[in-house]
Amino acid sequence: MSYFDINDILAEEQKITCNFFYDAYNLGQLEEGSRDPDMKKGSKVDLPYWMALALAKSNFVSVIMPPEYQDEYKNKLIADPNVISMRLFPYYDKIGVQLSDFFGDRKLKLLLFRVFRERFLNIYSQSINLKETDISKILGNLTYQEREVFSNGYKSSNDYDKWMSRKGEKVEKNTNNLLISTSSNNKNNSSNSSNNNSNNNNNNNNNNNNNNNNNNNNNNNNSNSNSNSNSNSSNGNNNNNSQNSSYKNTQSTTVKKRKRMFDDE
């Protein structure tokens, strides 16, 4: 069971007859028409299923199988499940499964499965074949699970008939949607192409900037090499000049020495 499912909550509110094993103080209000504030031992009280199950597990009460799950009613279901009205037992199958687990009654569980299977086929067949009819009386004789089966089949059948009767209109609408989607795709493609062109232009500009940077670097390298060569040549010239001057000084010194020697003689 789901905690937030309204049908599960209502199913657990179904009344089940219980027999108290002990005196229960301050629980007399549970018994309808009783003025005694306490519940006497042996009292039979109709309690909600959730309360009866909790008290039975604690051995405070014994649960009495409801009449609709006893042999008389079960024999009617076995004879012809489709003619039985479930107006008074909207949660017959759900509570029946839980009671079969509580009492360990496997035969009851098998009977519930068989009844649901046979009624399901008849209910589904009616739901897809009934057209433009009042279904409130049919739904009133079903359990809440059977109502869901019938409602889903009935709605699906009517939706299919409406779709078949307006098939041309549906195709036209789909064509318009196709044209709209095509135009939107073209717009998207054009915008994408413009974005690609702008990206290509940006890439070209970046390449040009890189080329300019490379040219500037080459020019700088050439200027540096020229300056280095000029400085080297100037250094070489300076060295040559210094060598020439030293050679001249040496020659002049030699001439002076020889002149002195001649003068001394």
Curated annotation (Swiss-Prot):
Q: What is its main location?
A: nucleus
Q: Which GO terms describe its biological process?
A: DNA replication; mitotic DNA replication initiation
Q: Which GO terms describe its cellular component?
A: GINS complex
Q: Where in the sequence does UniProt note compositional bias of the Basic residues kind?
A: 255-265
Which segments show compositional bias classed as Low complexity? 183-246
Q: Where is this region: Disordered?
A: 180-265
Keyword Transcription on entry: no
Pfam families, A to Z: PSF3_N, Sld5
Cellular location(s): Nucleus
Please provide the record's keywords in A-Z order: DNA replication, Nucleus
| InterPro entries with a match to the protein in the record | GINS_A (IPR021151), GINS_bundle-like_dom_sf (IPR036224), GINS_Psf3 (IPR010492), GINS_Psf3_sf (IPR038437), PSF3_N (IPR055221)
- Self-association and partners: Component of the GINS complex which is a heterotetramer of gins1, gins2, gins3 and gins4.
Family of the protein in this entry: Belongs to the GINS3/PSF3 family.
User: What is the purpose of this protein?
Assistant: The GINS complex plays an essential role in the initiation of DNA replication.
Q: What is the official name of this protein in its record?
A: Probable DNA replication complex GINS protein PSF3
